Amino acid sequence: MKRLLIIFVVAVSACKPPTPAEQMDSIQSWLATAELVGEAWLRHTTPDKYSRQTLELSRETLLQISSDLLKSPPHSVDSASLDSILTRSRVSVAQMARLIQAKDAPDFGRQLDSLRADQKLVKQLSDSIESRQ
């Protein structure tokens, strides 16, 4: 009986949708992944294919999390600003993947800088959401 109760509690917990703060944490994590892969690619320590695929996965995952978050945006932030920052971040990540294909390190570095600036804004929004939960 105890075992069934534990399984039920775990199953119910697993079905609970993530909170906006948890979604923002995931977004920050995927942006950090893109940043780290970008830095590694610029240092020539990761293969082009791996770097490009990781950036593409980051963009796709960011799109999914962002879409879910914006279906029911947190009340503590302006949803238009949040959407704008998240869209800009995804575009930067997608552009970085294309620039790897083109082997264009100078433009890649500029996109990486843009991504870093957006990461700071996402962190501020995330902190705002977390403090109001």
Q: How should these model regions be labeled?
A:
Residues 1-5, 24-27:
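Alpha-helical transmembrane segments
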Residues 4-13:
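Sec-dependent N-terminal signal peptides
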Residues 14-18:
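Bacterial signal peptide processing site
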Residues 22-95, 110-114:
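Alpha-helical segments in soluble extracytoplasmic regions
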Residues 86-128:
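Extracytosolic low-complexity repeat regions of secreted or lipid-anchored proteins
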Residues 130-133:
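Juxtamembrane amphipathic/coiled-coil helical coupling segments that flank
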